[in-house]
Amino acid sequence: MIKITKGLDLPIAGMPLQQISPAPAVKRVALLGEEYVGMRPAMAVKEGDRVKKGQILFEDKKIPGVCFTAPASGIVSAIHRGERRVLQSVVIDIEGNDAVAFTRYAADALAELPRDTVQQQLLASGQWTALRTRPFSKTPLPGSTPAAIFVNAMDTNPLAAEPQPIILAERAAFDAGLTVLTRLTDGKVHVCQPSGGKLGGHPLGQVCFNQFSGPHPAGLPGTHIHFLEPVSLNKQVWHLNYQDAIAIGKLFLDGELYCERIIALGGPQVTSPRLVKTTLGASLEDLLAGELQEGENRVISGSVLSGARAHGPHAFLGRFHLQVSVVKEGREKELFGWVMPGKEKFSITRTTLGHFFKRKRFHFSTDTNGGERAMVPIGNYERVMPLDILPTILLRDLLAGDTDSAQALGCLELDEEDLALCTYVCPGKYEYGPALRSVLTRIEQEG
C-alpha cells in the first residue's frame, strides 16, 4: 500500500448519501467537443438527423479512425459551435431504444482476442475515447501500445461517489473490461483502489491491484502513475475510470454500447445529495430539475476543484465526469471581511477561525475572496502536493511559460486536475490548470 500524507480533503457541505436513488427523467444528451484535447471534428451528422445509440456523430480529423458515437438514440436537435467554429456540443433529443449492434464474445474468449480485434471494436463503438494518455491527456493513437494501463477504482474528489459498491455490483463486467484492456498492452493493467479495498483475484497475472491511502489527491490517476509507472516523452501510459472499464466489459459481453452512469449529486445547494443512475452526457438542466435550493447557483460537471461550469451549450454531464457539484454564486460583498474571525470560512492556513474546526462542513461559494496578485511562496503548495516535485518552482515556470524548466521539473506527469489543489490554496489566485495546458501544448508541438 502507498500512503499519501500531503493533500487536502476539502470540508464542503452537501456530501451525497452513498445509496442509489431514482433520478429525474432526462430528455436530452450531448457530446461535448471541447473535452477532447486537440480534437478537430469531421461531422457525420447534421441537425435533424435520426441516430441510433452507438452511431458515429463525428470523427477526429487529426486521428483518423477515432470515432465519437451517440450515447442514446433520437434526433440531433442542435450542433453548437463557439469562436472559430470550435465544436461545443452535439445535442440529441432522446427517442426510442434503437442501438447499433457490435460483436459479442464469451467471457472465457476475451483473453485470447487479437489486439487488432479489440482495438477495432473500441474504435467503432466510440469506447476508445474513454482512454487518455499520460503525458498530454489526449486520446491515444490507434495502433500505439502503452507501457501500462491504469484503471482508477477510487475517488478522493470532494463530494464523490464511493466506487467499490458500484464495481462489486457489476463485478463480471468489470473483470471482463480488465481482460479486454490486457489485450492492448504488453505491460501491467494497474487497478488502483483505496486502503481496505475488496477488489482482487483476477485470473490474469497481468492485472495487478494497488492500494492508496490518504487525502486528496490520493485518488487521482496522476498520483498513481507517478508512484507506479512514471512517464516521459518516450514512455506513455493510458488511464480510464472504473465505470468506463465496466462499459468496455459490457460492450464485449453484450454487443451493445453501455452508457448508464452512476453519478454523485452533491454540494451545499443540492436539496437531497445522493447517488443517481443516469446516462452519459445527460442534460444537467433535466437532471437537476427540482433538486436545487433557490438562488443563483453554479452547476459544475465534475469536482468543485477541477470540474467544468455547466451552462448553455455545455450544460451536460462531461464524458469523464462521475459527479455533479452545485455551489452558490458568491456575489455578496462583505464589509471589512478580512478583519472578521471567519467562523464560517475555511482556510488551509490559520487566517480564519474556521481553520480550527476540523469536523465542520462549510458552505463554499464561487467567491475567491480577492483577485490576482503576486505569487507568494508561503508553503501552501508543498502542503497539498504529494508528488516528488518542487511545486513552487514548477508553478512559477508554468506561469512564465518556461517549457524547458517545467519539463525538467516533471510537468509531463501532470494534468490540470493534478494542480487543482494548488490553485485552491494559492494566495495569488492563479489558475494553474490553463497554464499547464499551454506549456504541455507547446512541448508537444516543439517535440
From Swiss-Prot:
Under which main EC class is this enzyme filed? translocase
GO molecular function terms noted in the UniProt entry: oxidoreductase activity, acting on NAD(P)H, quinone or similar compound as acceptor
Instruction: Name any one Pfam family assigned in the record.
Output: NQRA_SLBB
Entry similarity comment = Belongs to the NqrA family.
Q: Which organism is it from?
A: Klebsiella pneumoniae subsp. pneumoniae (strain ATCC 700721 / MGH 78578)
Has UniProt tagged this entry with the keyword Transport? yes
Give the GO biological process terms. Answer: sodium ion transport
Q: Does the record carry Transferase as a key word?
A: no
Which named protein is this? Na(+)-translocating NADH-quinone reductase subunit A
Subunit structure of this entry?
Composed of six subunits; NqrA, NqrB, NqrC, NqrD, NqrE and NqrF.
Q: What InterPro entries does the record tag this protein with? A: NqrA, NQRA_2nd, NqrA_C_domain, NQRA_N
Q: Which Gene3D superfamilies does this one have?
A: 2.40.50.100
Catalytic reaction equation(s): a ubiquinone + n Na(+)(in) + NADH + H(+) = a ubiquinol + n Na(+)(out) + NAD(+)
Stated role: NQR complex catalyzes the reduction of ubiquinone-1 to ubiquinol by two successive reactions, coupled with the transport of Na(+) ions from the cytoplasm to the periplasm. NqrA to NqrE are probably involved in the second step, the conversion of ubisemiquinone to ubiquinol.
- According to its UniProt record, the EC number is 7.2.1.1
Coiled-coil zones? none
Q: Please name the gene that encodes this protein.
A: nqrA
This protein's UniProt keywords: Ion transport, NAD, Sodium, Sodium transport, Translocase, Transport, Ubiquinone
The superkingdom listed in its UniProt entry is: Bacteria
